[in-house]
């Protein structure tokens, strides 16, 4: 009888220990998950602001974009738009700091792949940016192992996006074959970095990040992209406008207009450009830039949900 009671007591204690161990493990998982969610939320919330700011380490994200969706402006029209915006600047608390024409074109990267022991060429959809002065929306090459090199200065050089370089095994000094329009040329990779339009690395409008080898972006000099696309010097299809400081803007996920001054400025610039240019143009702030907005929404969502998610776990 004593032996039987001892065995039953041992089994009962074992079950109790197992339950205690299971509960302890669940608590530990919840604590570590909560710490991870909180760390991510707080990190990304401040990180993007630091990247976008006008500093030695930032890119100086534009405050207003003017886009020609149907073609390009020549150098005279590009300069006229900037002059018109400056001359017609409204009476506002926001002051114009800079206006910079920019060229951005859809194109192709020609990627060599080996399949079944034979080499073939794969066409990868791409977006190419011509960045000359680069006072606004600069290419970002952080001091980190991920990135290296310098900006493109000659018309035969290119900076490749870090996700493209890692996914396609491209290194500094490599030559890449790219195209835009009917042109196809080879460019030397002199830098590996990022750009604000592609921090969320996906084709425009796609909610899913691009798989390696399916999308490419690169940052050439203005003359390099003009040479590639065979268009005249000084051509642009985007005007970047920088306002002194960092004005508030209307956040799409709220009912309130947090950036009334900037919204009024966007309307004024839209009217100015419409008077200068017959073709329709798009004028918008950062809330309409896909990569910028989806990352902001991600950071906002992380801050809102990490506490209840941790509680549910």
Where is each model-derived feature located?
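Membrane transport/envelope proteins' first extracytoplasmic loop
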Residues: 2-313
């Amino acid at each position: 009888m004593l032996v039987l009671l001892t065995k039953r007591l041992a089994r009962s204690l074992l079950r109790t220990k197992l339950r205690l161990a299971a509960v302890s493990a669940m608590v530990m998982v919840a604590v570590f998950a909560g710490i991870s969610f909180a760390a991510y939320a707080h990190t990304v919330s401040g990180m993007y602001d630091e990247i976008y700011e006008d500093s030695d380490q930032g890119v100086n994200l534009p405050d207003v974009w003017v886009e020609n969706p149907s073609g390009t402006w020549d150098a005279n029209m590009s300069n006229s738009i900037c002059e018109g915006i400056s001359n017609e600047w409204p009476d506002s608390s926001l002051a114009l700091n800079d206006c910079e024409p920019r060229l951005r074109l859809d194109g192709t990267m020609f990627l060599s792949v080996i399949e079944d022991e034979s080499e073939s060429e794969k066409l990868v959809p791409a977006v190419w940016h011509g960045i000359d002065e680069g006072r606004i929306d600069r290419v970002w090459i952080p001091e980190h192992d991920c990135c290296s090199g310098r900006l493109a200065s000659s018309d035969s050089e290119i900076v490749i996006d870090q996700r493209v370089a890692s996914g396609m095994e491209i290194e500094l000094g490599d030559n890449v074959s790219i195209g835009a329009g009917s042109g196809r040329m080879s460019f030397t990779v002199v830098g590996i970095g990022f750009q604000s339009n592609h921090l969320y690395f996906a084709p425009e409008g796609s909610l899913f990040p691009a798989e390696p080898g399916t999308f490419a972006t690169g940052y050439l000099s203005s003359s390099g992209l003009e040479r590639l696309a065979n268009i005249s010097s000084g051509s642009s299809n985007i005007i970047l406008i920088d306002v002194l400081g960092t004005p508030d803007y209307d956040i799409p996920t709220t009912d309130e207009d947090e950036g009334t001054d900037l919204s009024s400025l966007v309307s004024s610039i839209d009217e100015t450009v419409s008077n200068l240019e017959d073709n329709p143009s798009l004028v918008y702030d950062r809330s309409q830039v896909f990569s910028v907005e989806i990352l902001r929404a991600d950071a906002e969502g992380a801050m809102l949900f990490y506490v209840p998610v941790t509680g549910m776990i």
